[in-house]
Amino acid sequence: MTDVLPAGPGRYPAAAPASEALFARARALVPGGVNSPVRAFRAVGGTPRFMVRGEGPWLYDADGRRYVDLVCSWGPMILGHAHPAVVEALHSAAALGTSFGAPTPGEVELAAEIVDRTPVEQVRLVSSGTEATMSAIRLARGCTGRARIIKFAGCYHGHSDALLAAAGSGVATFGLPDSPGVTDAAAGDTIVLPYNDIQAVEAAFAAEGPQIAAIITEAAAGNMGVVAPRDDFNQRLAAIAHANGALLIVDEVMTGFRVSRAGWHGLDACPADLWTYGKVMGGGLPAAAFGGRAEIMAQLAPAGPVYQAGTLSGNPLACAAGLTTLRLADDALYRRLDDTAAVVGRLAGDALAAAGVPHRLSYAGNMFSIFFTDADVVDYASARTQQVPAFKAFFHAMLEAGVYLPPSAFESWFVSAAIDDTALEQIAAALPAAAAAAAAGHGG
């Protein structure tokens, strides 16, 4: 790797020859050149940066450039990159073997940590958030004997067929209503409603209540950009579901263990039936989980009739990284995340206001987004009013100044506890030029 180039606005050339060469090679080998669509930079243009190293708040690309990381691997890296305790835990676990296909002490310890921190009484470990939500829905259907599921437009629950209808995240990024390959039969039992609209939920149950197995919602929406639930929206979802014999599934894959020790539940104490987790609980490795009340979880095989399995579920390396991360994530760390997110958001908002750029700063705990719009953002429709060209210009100016943002206007920004004064100074120095670029790009 070449020496790190100096940080600061305008000091990074737009060209990234090593990343460009890697991307060209990747496109010949991997569809679109990436293994998850948003990484391709299609929403913002240009060449995706191929990262070779992370340390604390910093990412280093193949061209030797250093960036303050405000993506944090899409949420998991609350401690920052290569935290010494996590690295040591991984070294120790790997020395004992990387996978056994049998129960391990580590998965028991990780399950105990999750149960201790959250309202779930039992938890099943899996390898991805998609697996977690897919399995939770199967379990809800098995418990209720019903087929239909309510989800909300702009909420993303992984890429299983039934949940891609009007999804956020990559689907929002690419402007797709759903996905080819999803059959009418697979999507036919999914009812899609506007987010934050409790009257629409009441109407759906009035029309089809006896067929509805569950409502699934993000604890706080983070995949159409960050949109917090209004008032007591989540609690009212629980009340409506329970009054009609249905279950409430709260998707905390993104918020879980990021916004508080107990995830979003630590902020609103919503009485759901099932919860899904991921991202932070793996400490940067592939791990996820779903859990809930013991009588519901008892319906899972081998204890019950609802089948779910996974070859690498409870992988010892993922459990070691996740358990170490969670044990380091105390109340002081969450205060630091909250404070850092507030500072970064204020710096960005002040710069955009000074440049005359219409915007809305939207928080859910320490997750946040900037919507380039005059409109109040409360759901997917209002999120889509933003000026994407303004975000593109803003993104590239920040990238060239050494700040790595999510390469989509419809994603959350994430901070880590490793962000220090040096990193904040680099962000602050980058923002005026980026705000000016957004002003020039607005309406373009």
Swiss-Prot record:
Family stated for the protein in its record: Belongs to the class-III pyridoxal-phosphate-dependent aminotransferase family. HemL subfamily.
Catalytic activity, reaction form: (S)-4-amino-5-oxopentanoate = 5-aminolevulinate
SUPFAM superfamilies: PLP-dependent transferases
Locations listed in the record: Cytoplasm
Name of the protein described by the UniProt record: Glutamate-1-semialdehyde 2,1-aminomutase
Enzyme class, UniProt record, top EC level: isomerase
Residues spanning the membrane: none
InterPro entries from the UniProt entry: 4pyrrol_synth_GluAld_NH2Trfase, Aminotrans_3, PyrdxlP-dep_Trfase, PyrdxlP-dep_Trfase_major, PyrdxlP-dep_Trfase_small
Cellular component GO terms held in the UniProt record: cytoplasm
Subunit note: Homodimer.
Cross-referenced PANTHER family: GLUTAMATE-1-SEMIALDEHYDE 2,1-AMINOMUTASE, GLUTAMATE-1-SEMIALDEHYDE 2,1-AMINOMUTASE 1, CHLOROPLASTIC-RELATED
